A protein has these predicted regions:
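A helix-centric hydrophobic-segment signal that preferentially recognizes long
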Residues: 2-186
């Protein structure tokens, strides 16, 4: 066997490895996109639930206008957010506003006993659980993707083909705000 054939064989093997690595990165990137779309579906359902929740609360706690306005503003910001980082930050604000809205039920026993409010609160809780599961799946997909672009041989050409690190969907610094127990004044 001549040296030319050996060199050609090595080049073919390297090209095949490169194609395989590239295709793996494409698949991982698509998985991240699908996972974010799954989060988006859950968030849209939550956004669609909020007007009904506000209308129900408004009937019992009309003078809590500030809290209701905060929820509406946070919902609008969340609906217009783009990209995982921006969406996560906006959704954190919305979660905090919703926590304060739900806490109003403690100050209004008639609201707390309202069947429609209870149903909406249950639906919201279910959606929060689905969002948390979707977020975990998304973050797992991002972790696999980010690891994939840093591993050899993909690390050699990932940047050249536009594969860059992706952001996690993380509660981050505003996590404490979301987890804070709202104070209800009587």
């Amino acid at each position: 066997m001549s040296t030319g054939w050996i060199v050609l064989g090595v080049i073919v093997i390297l090209v095949l490895f490169a194609f395989g690595a590239y295709n793996r990165l494409v698949a991982l990137s698509q998985r991240v996109g699908q996972a974010f779309a799954d989060i988006d579906v859950q968030l849209k359902q939550r956004h669609d639930l909020i007007p009904n929740l506000i209308e129900t609360v408004k009937g019992y706690a009309a003078h809590e206008r500030g809290t209701l306005d905060d929820v509406v503003k946070a919902r609008n910001a969340a609906m217009s957010a783009q990209g995982p980082g921006q969406v996560a930050a906006a959704e954190n604000q919305l979660s905090g506003a919703l926590s304060r809205l739900i806490a109003l039920s403690e100050a209004y026993p008639d609201l707390k006993a309202n069947a429609n409010f209870q149903q909406l609160q249950s639906e919201l809780s279910d959606l929060e659980n689905k969002i948390a599961a979707s977020r975990r799946f998304f973050n797992n997909a991002v972790q696999e993707y980010n690891t994939g672009i840093q591993q050899m041989p993909a690390a050699l050409f990932a940047g050249a083909f536009g594969f860059t690190r992706k952001e996690f969907f993380d509660l981050g610094a505003s996590r404490t705000e979301v987890e804070q127990v709202p104070t209800v004044k009587f």
